[in-house]
């Protein structure tokens, strides 16, 4: 993971935490345990970082929902 994708992941953790009224550490655990960080956010950074924050937050929520994780 390079600096840019790392910063993006941190930003998205905080954006999701704000949107879902959760603390960032809980969101990190959800994303890490579901594989969202390593299998979605980092590999698709080039596309995702060009999208709006709300769009990516919704996309992450959908990713988690498909895997049976409720936020």
Describe every region a protein language model picked out.
Residues 1-71:
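C-terminal alpha-helical interaction appendages
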